[in-house]
Amino acid sequence: MVTGHPAGLPPLFLDRSLGRRQVPELLRAAGLQLQTLSEVYGIPADEDVSDVDWLELAGGHGWPVLMKDERIRYRPAERDALLMNEVKGFCLTSGNLRAAEMADQFLAVIDSVADACVEPGPFLYAVSVRGLSRLDLS
């Protein structure tokens, strides 16, 4: 079990796809430092923030992004924002997980996330019960 934020890992940024409360609370309870889209933009403004805007923000701050929308790499505007802003992304591959399962999958790979973040972005990794696997952005 994780007991603290890995050394050298910047604060994490959580996309709205992970929810406003349950997943962030579980990750914080494990000691991770993070910000959510709703904390940065406020409620209800967070509902109207485009993926392009928050990808630019996260990349500009060097915040690794945790998300659930791996299709982001196929949408031209979002893919371009991910690439141009050198985003370091980590995406759950299963869309049918409860909050505790989502948090558990991220916590199980958090040391690998920290290791990956030593490298420059942009990149996108799939997160699954088997660990991390780098996704093609070309």
Predicted regions and their residues:
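Acidic, metal-coordinating catalytic cores used for nucleic-acid/nucleotide bond scission
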Residues: 17-18, 42-48, 69-75
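Hydrophobic/aromatic beta-strand patches that form the interior of the parallel beta-sheet core
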Residues: 66, 88-90, 125
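Catalytic phosphate/metal-binding cores of nucleic-acid and nucleotide-processing enzymes, i.e., regions
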Residues: 33, 39-40, 46, 83-84, ...
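Nuclease catalytic cores that cleave nucleic-acid phosphodiester bonds
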Residues: 59, 74-85, 90-97
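Acidic, metal-binding active-site segment of PIN/NYN-like and related structure-specific nucleases
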Residues: 51, 58-59, 64-78
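Non-catalytic interface/targeting segments
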Residues: 1-30, 39-40, 92-138
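Short low-complexity, flexible loop/linker segments enriched in glycine and/or proline
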Residues: 49-53, 80-84, 105-107
